[in-house]
Amino acid sequence: HEAALFALDAHPKLPAAPSLPRRSATEGMVAQAAWGIPGVMVLDDGSLLVDEAAIDPAAPLVDGGVGGEPFVGLRAFLEVLAGRVGPFKLQLTGPLTLALALHAVGVDADRAFAVAGKAVTARIGAALAAARRAAPGATPVLFLDEPGLTAALDPGFPFELESALDLVSSAMALVEESAIAGLHCCGRADWQAVLQAGPQILSLPVGAGAVEHAGALAGFLERGGWIAWGAVPTDGPLTMAADVLWRHLWAEWDGLTAAGCDPVLLRQRAIITPACGLVGFEPRQAEQVSALAAHLAQRLESQSLGTGVDLGA
């Protein structure tokens, strides 16, 4: 509950459901996603023990809901925001990343692919149903976390790129039926390919190669897409001041503008976030990261208003 209240206080416009793997390793992204798959045991340390003979793509999840140990943070969050009418953010591990994790512990690539798609589909439905019960008047934003997309063009990638994108796209389409669909990828990727999965919001870190795919991002913005810019690094000590982070963000936008992106749309359709999750931080450090992201967002809003740019909602 403390983490849920922190999320509401730190990001009142779009609070995010916390995952708490330091409370229980089963809340780690792979463990959480694999929970309930027949033939997969999630151990207390979050690792997976697989009985490959029991892996069956046709079998339903043993536990496909959000009532188990891996979803304590989510349930606390939904309890705290009960009755909310403003948007809020949920996140689940995407099917491609789960498929890669299953394959890494010995599941045949084709079966891992099929099982992961079904598991994530079931979990999306359960999470959004729980969100509707908690806040029927609100529109949730559900992000699929797909770090696996950073490896999609590597020579040893076990799946065809088109099939991988179709897998993610199918999950995105399900989300979009009752929520705003976001896609988070926490490293450098082929953003033109990633956008083929069809997110309404793309979340990526500043400095992750966006300028190399300016044309694809320009088209995405023109079609109504939003970009969540991970402008506050979360992969090490907090050593950069807000002014430095602002300059990094502005330099990225300058590069995109020079490559053809509409500078007004870049700012109108921007969300400022930490680069990734806060699992490695103590509460005081998490507060600092959140405060930096809020400061950058307020600075963007102030400068945009000063130049007549309408940031909308």
Residue locations for each model-derived region?
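Active-site-proximal beta-alpha loop/turn segments in soluble metabolic enzymes
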Residues: 98-112, 143-160, 230-239, 273-282
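Alpha/beta catalytic barrel-like cores
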Residues: 1-109, 200, 225, 253-261, ...
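Active-site loop segments of alpha/beta catalytic cores
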Residues: 90, 105, 111-212
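Short, well-ordered coil/turn elements that cap or connect secondary structure elements
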Residues: 83-85, 137, 176-178, 222, ...
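Soluble or luminal CAZymes and related metallo-dependent hydrolases
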Residues: 69-73, 116-120, 163, 244-248
